[in-house]
């Protein structure tokens, strides 16, 4: 259902206060074939960017000055009304992993990170995210079909009701032979 071209065309936001990390992740993802990359070193900009672009994946550093990744995740939860916030956290703090997952992150990568592991986790998360989006779309189509069928059924019931009301006005006569 999801092919590699869909995954490579997914939108990704990279958020890290270290320019070297942003450049490394951008280069790695571009070399892997990803085409829709955005990055910011300003954690305050993340919510507005996501509100405008609805990224398929956000790579989020947890330790940033001014606003940490946990505060960013709380802001993103307010935007994503369906409860699914597509965040892969990047952290050097071992104690932050479980806290990040509990706060809504879907996965994490420990710094310093292994590029093969990061690419694999990104690919897997995007595959799940795109499948989730396909499922949402399919559910909407099913709901539309149910609404259409319900309307057709109501219309059919109304026609039947009108016919039975007319039939009660009719009367039948038979002769002695039953004709």
Regions found by a protein language model. Give the residues of each.
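N-terminal membrane insertion elements
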Residues: 2-147
């Amino acid at each position: 259902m999801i092919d590699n071209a869909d995954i490579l065309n997914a939108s990704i936001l990279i958020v890290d206060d270290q320019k070297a990390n942003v450049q490394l992740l951008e280069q790695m993802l571009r070399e892997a074939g990803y085409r829709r990359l955005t990055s910011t070193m300003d954690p305050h900009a993340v919510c507005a960017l996501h509100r405008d672009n609805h990224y398929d994946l956000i790579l989020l550093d947890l330790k940033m000055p001014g606003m940490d990744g946990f505060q960013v995740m709380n802001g993103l939860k307010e935007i994503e009304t369906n409860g699914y916030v597509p965040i892969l956290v990047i952290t050097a703090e071992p104690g932050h992993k479980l806290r990040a997952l509990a706060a809504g992150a879907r996965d994490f990568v420990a710094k310093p990170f292994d590029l093969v592991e990061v690419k694999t986790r990104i690919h897997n998360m995007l595959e799940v995210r795109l499948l989730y989006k396909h499922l949402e779309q399919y559910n909407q189509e099913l709901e539309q079909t149910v609404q259409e069928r319900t309307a057709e059924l109501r219309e059919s019931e109304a026609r039947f009701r009108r016919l039975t009301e007319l039939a009660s006005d009719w009367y039948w006569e038979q002769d002695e032979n039953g004709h």
